[in-house]
């Protein structure tokens, strides 16, 4: 039979059939009848489409080969014969441009004249039996069915045969010829008898031998063999069954499974209120660095030495003054804290010998800023259980905050490239196995795309600050230790660079439990005027501390330099995770790898090189009010990294809850897009669970806004 197929059919058809069988894990040397059936079906699909065009007036015309008008639009789009991913892409494209309903199963053709998908069937049995099987499988009135047999019979939906008599006769003649050729070689009987009913992929796999015995032994109770269980599963109606089971559980439970349709979901309700404020542990897009290139000073690498060297690069210091007070704080204390820091650094310089660490004097302003002696005294419960009015503190409900544009700007900035390199390629030994070679190639490509990214700077900054703060918290528990906020990078030319963002002063830190809090005051340099977005800086007291000369197109311009000061706190567990922010690189690399794997499995070869080097291709990045945003593979890498970094920087119970609950809603919407007819009960309860996490967190509110954009475009 295999030889006959290769002689009888066009080599292109044979090649497509081989690919299709390979895709479903079938061996054409064994399944020779299936090989012949696939080739026959492909040929009928191609013949159905041949010579049929649509002219400029939108009329269907037949044009024989060699005709000069052959540049007309093809009447039929051929879907059969393409690999699954490409075929679904074509189907989705047709649905988007024509408004046709998306079919559940891949059809064979699309008819641009009648605006409908067509399912072609070729049967060795009775046409009406095969027609009913097809209709039963597809369950869609929108897809047109047309069945041909090897005996010259045909059957089509509503007896609408689509094509003219002559075109259909050509197909019937070809099928009759194939039958005659098979019969003359003694192949027809086997081929005719081998046809099974319309089958799904799962049914094609025959289980025999040991696996069959294991299958029969592994059934749920009350099933004697695999066939009985399969029959039960095929006839299973999940929605009704779940309703029935729930009603048996309790009289109070009454869940009706409601169909989830395009019109069912509503947008998430974002809270009203004043705009949300910045709550990260350090400044992001607004940070300013004082930097030294090619550091080679004495004590290079010791934070305090590096910090003093960076401070010396700036000459524009001036008498500080408050430009944006903190509404609830004692603002002069913040001002005095900065003045104290400058004075104590000056003392170090005057002494000439710089110590490795610096503990600040415990002044009244620092004691206030670090909450010294502010914690209520702890009393043993046994000593006060007789107190009649003993009760827990009344805690206020958190104030609702609305989404503000600054958080989207922060995210956009995190995705951008800087002019510095923040991570090096790992120095890893020679690859031993091919898989290691592919892995290190992917890692190197990915690193090249993200090494200049601002999100990578945030990772290195976060790792440094959390490591330094945790070390100081353990090594100098009672001291108000000064911790410079430092990062290191390379310039594009490869020169080393040390950057100072500002300082942290740590409070008392007797951290016994993971969640015990250490207070700290952060003082960070910036060129951002806080009066432009005062709501963003609600938690900060901002000082003007100097003037910085900047090079611009107009020559040198002077800009005021600000110091953003605030009291903050963290815990051992938060610092531990902050120290491990490099994991964000790994997480986003794994997401990119899964995209490469999907592409590679379709193409049947490793696509890493093509994936990163094909600069013309664009990929979906995310949803915005405009629709699906697309960008280069580098932009995708940086966006995924920025999302992972922001999940770390803005980690909170609100984010945990929103991620877990919105994921359920997302899966239901995905099921709807995949035509899986999802059903839900208590959808209102799910919305409630999602929306109770939308309180005041800027990152959660932004994600909720993205989710609404996704809903809008996914359900068009």
Curated annotation (Swiss-Prot):
How is this protein annotated for GO cellular component? host cell cytoplasm; host cell nucleus
Keywords, in A-Z order = Cap snatching, Endonuclease, Eukaryotic host gene expression shutoff by virus, Eukaryotic host transcription shutoff by virus, Host cytoplasm, Host gene expression shutoff by virus, Host nucleus, Host-virus interaction, Hydrolase, Inhibition of host RNA polymerase II by virus, Manganese, Metal-binding, Nuclease, Phosphoprotein
Explain the post-translational modification. Phosphorylated on serines and threonines by host kinases, including human casein kinase II.
Q: Which residues bind Mn(2+) 2?
A: 80, 108
What is its subcellular localisation? Host cytoplasm; Host nucleus
A biological-process GO annotation: cap snatching
Q: Does the keyword Transcription apply?
A: no
Q: Which residue positions does the secretion signal occupy?
A: none
Q: Where does it primarily localize? A: host cell
Motif annotated as Nuclear localization signal 1 (NLS1), chain positions:
124-139
Q: Which residues bind Mn(2+) 1?
A: 41, 108, 119-120
> Which GO molecular function entries does the Swiss-Prot or TrEMBL record give?
endonuclease activity; metal ion binding; RNA binding
Paste the cofactor note.
Binds 2 manganese ions per subunit.
**Tagged with keyword Amino-acid biosynthesis:** no
What is the superkingdom listed in this entry's lineage? Viruses
Any Pfam family:
Flu_PA
Motif (Nuclear localization signal 2 (NLS2)) on chain:
184-247
- InterPro entries linked: INFV_PA, PA/PA-X, PA/PA-X_sf
E.C. number? 3.1.-.-
Principal EC category: hydrolase
What cofactors does this protein use?
Answer: Mn(2+)
What the record says about family reads: Belongs to the influenza viruses PA family.
Q: How does it assemble?
A: Influenza RNA polymerase is composed of three subunits: PB1, PB2 and PA. Interacts (via C-terminus) with PB1 (via N-terminus).
What's this chain's function? Plays an essential role in viral RNA transcription and replication by forming the heterotrimeric polymerase complex together with PB1 and PB2 subunits. The complex transcribes viral mRNAs by using a unique mechanism called cap-snatching. It consists in the hijacking and cleavage of host capped pre-mRNAs. These short capped RNAs are then used as primers for viral mRNAs. The PB2 subunit is responsible for the binding of the 5' cap of cellular pre-mRNAs which are subsequently cleaved after 10-13 nucleotides by the PA subunit that carries the endonuclease activity.
Q: List the protein's name.
A: Polymerase acidic protein
Source organism of this protein record: Influenza A virus (strain A/USA:Iowa/1943 H1N1)
